[in-house]
């Protein structure tokens, strides 16, 4: 292990060892994590142990093979990653639909049987497809699978990503496009995964857009901008205000922290701070 990776890993292990009584979060929001917030060197088991000790409720973007590890620590597998395609190849191209319909319907059954509330999906990249045609194709696909999702009580969440910095050519890169798709599908189980980091880069106006389009949002992700690092004052977003705005809308879903610690930082301390910011 390199020295620069060893110290944060050591801090995480120490924090986990010292926390014998789990923190009970008293705020209105249910918070989750992704693997990246723990840095590069922590095992899934250790990250679950630490997350549970800090009052985290769930773990995003984890597949079925690892669900038992999450559940061992009382964590909900909050967002199933994989069956809904990939960022570049997903719902906006009809040639993907047959395979994705099969995998999505199977995943809905699997999620329902295992207490997993949501499945992530994507628009896909534009390539040669125009935005209007891509939206039509996404609507057509989601209309095929929504009844099964509704019957099983599983959310299908399409992620809103930026095409300016991280995901060049991604189609769902403005909130208006995604809201149009959601309105046309019009299902209580088909929603937007509103990634606040990506939204800030593309449209900004975070709180107004969340309030205006709240009925179409099923999950949130966080990350500091610029850089997708910790949520402190080294970045531009006022996450405490954003958290309060979300809670004031009586949001009952999950907020997932999805950032990577800056070099030399203590990931445990940064996660503690993120959880406290959203404990409103």
Question: Can you name each region flagged by the protein language model?
Answer:
Residues 2-32, 37, 41-52, 116-117, ...:
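Histidine-acidic metal/acid-base catalytic patches
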Residues 10, 16, 23-25, 90-191, ...:
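Active-site acidic/histidine proton-transfer and metal-coordination neighborhood
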Residues 37-39, 63-65, 83-85, 125-127, ...:
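Active-site-proximal loop/turn and secondary-structure-junction residues that shape catalytic pockets
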Residues 47-66:
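Catalytic domains of carbohydrate-active enzymes, especially glycoside hydrolases
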Residues 52, 71, 112, 150, ...:
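Anion (oxyanion) recognition and catalysis
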Residues 68-80, 154:
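Short acidic, glycine/proline-enriched helix-loop-strand junctions
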């Amino acid at each position: 292990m390199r020295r620069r990776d060893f110290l944060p890993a050591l801090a995480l292990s120490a924090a986990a060892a010292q926390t014998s009584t789990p923190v009970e979060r008293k705020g209105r929001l249910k918070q989750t994590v992704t693997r990246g917030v723990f840095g590069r060197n922590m095992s899934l088991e250790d990250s679950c142990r630490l997350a549970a000790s800090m009052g985290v409720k769930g773990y995003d973007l984890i597949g079925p093979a690892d669900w038992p590890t999450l559940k061992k620590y009382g964590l909900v597998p909050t967002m199933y990653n994989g069956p809904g395609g990939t960022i570049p190849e997903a719902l906006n191209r009809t040639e993907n639909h047959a395979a994705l319909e099969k995998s999505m319907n199977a995943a809905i059954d699997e999620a329902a049987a295992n207490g997993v509330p949501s499945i992530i999906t994507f628009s896909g990249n534009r390539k040669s497809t125009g935005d209007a045609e891509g939206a039509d194709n996404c609507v057509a696909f989601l209309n095929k699978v929504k009844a099964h999702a509704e019957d099983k009580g599983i959310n299908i969440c399409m992620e809103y990503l930026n095409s300016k910095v991280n995901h060049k050519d991604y189609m769902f890169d403005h909130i208006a496009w995604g809201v149009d798709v959601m309105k046309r599908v019009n299902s209580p189980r088909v929603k937007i995964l509103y990634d606040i980091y990506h939204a800030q880069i593309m449209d900004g106006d975070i709180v107004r857009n969340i309030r205006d389009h709240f009925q179409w949002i099923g999950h949130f992700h966080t990350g500091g901008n610029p850089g997708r690092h910790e949520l402190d004052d080294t970045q531009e977003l006022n996450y405490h205000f954003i958290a309060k705005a979300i809670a004031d809308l009586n949001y009952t879903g999950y907020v997932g922290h999805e950032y990577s610690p800056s070099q030399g930082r203590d990931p445990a301390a940064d996660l503690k701070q993120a959880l406290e910011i959203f404990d409103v």
